Amino acid sequence: MKKLLLLVSCMIMLYSCEDKPTLQKYYVKNTESPKFIALDLASSIIKTDKISLTETEKAALESFDKMNILAFRTDSTDITGYDKEIKEVKAILKDESYQQLMKAGSGNDGAAIYFVGNDDEHIEEFVVLAGKKENGFAVVRVLGNDMNPTHIM
């Protein structure tokens, strides 16, 4: 009986360790690549003591934790690199946890905004994907707690 319980526990642990691609894994994997530019910004970069803010603006800033930016630079000698990388990011964003908020542009040129959260007023993460085949693309992750898009706009 103890062996069966141990076996079931191990199976549950292995099953819960999903190995599906995520934006976080993609970001970590490509941070050191020479084809990418990576930047992390903390909420402390915004000095609120020198500006006057409304209560709504204060609430928006308090819900913001950090921002991760990952940009892919298109190389004229390697056009297929753009197609491969943008396809990988778009595949990650097709996961059901990412909900599209809006989209602009057409084809490979344009931008889209996604969010992760229980509903559209309690958002944990915003993701902006913008790109142009000739220049490259950028993925911007804005992480926070209970972010509300009406406070940001």
Regions found by a protein language model. Give the residues of each.
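Positively charged n-region of N-terminal signal peptides that target proteins for export
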Residues: 1-4
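Extracytoplasmic electrostatic interaction patches
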Residues: 105-153
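C-terminal motif of bacterial Sec signal peptides marking the signal peptidase cleavage site
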Residues: 13-16
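Alpha-helix initiation and N-capping motif
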Residues: 20, 86, 149-152
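Function-determining sites in protein domains
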Residues: 76-79, 83-110
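Sec-dependent N-terminal signal peptides
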Residues: 6-8
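Early exported N-terminus immediately downstream of N-terminal targeting peptides
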Residues: 23-89
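Contiguous interface-forming segments/domains that mediate binding rather than catalysis
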Residues: 18-28, 94-97, 105-107, 136
